């Protein structure tokens, strides 16, 4: 894909797969999204929450608490099959262009899974021989634990999503900032492309007369949190480190 990681493309939606994926996501608006990946062979199995000090400030605290509740199901299921695992290390919840973080700006719970890779059928590791069937078993097991968590926590998850959108809409209505204007008649192409990206996320974009700006994005709409995630400039951080967002 021209050296561009599909799992950084959830916000810019430049590749065909990303456009289809974001459209499907927006149509369904899931309560939980699982994002399955592989990591270095000598690692075991990771599931979120990630490093607590590296959570994007726009993500509600309740999101992380629900992620921890779901994590207990993963731990329980992996304990039953004797698989090693860890959490709250290595990975974070900061960049919204990843599959495990994009849901956090849309009222859902995004969960990253990272499995130590067998790099094919079988590989020696610091933890012993690692086989491809073993890695698949861990990924499948945490898929089933997620389904169990979604079923048993459904009331909390549904309430969270409802409150997420109600609170964001009310905050936008009370805010002195009513929207974001961008573009002009001297830069039609880039302005059009940015507007197209926003529309791909089902964000309302109004085309103006172009005297001051070409497009206007009102904050008082369903996707207000996602708009802030895309346009806000965050300059204060609890941690100085971040997982790769390139």
Protein language model regions, located:
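Divalent-metal coordination cores built from histidine and acidic residues
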Residues: 1-8
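Proline-aspartate-enriched helix->loop->beta-strand connector
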Residues: 25-39
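Short glycine-enriched loops at secondary-structure junctions
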Residues: 38-40, 116-117
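Intrinsic-disorder/low-complexity accessory segments
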Residues: 8-9, 14-16, 20, 24, ...
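Acidic active-site catalytic centers that drive phospho-/nucleotidyl reactions
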Residues: 5, 35, 114
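Active-site environment of divalent metal-dependent phosphoester hydrolases
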Residues: 39-43, 189
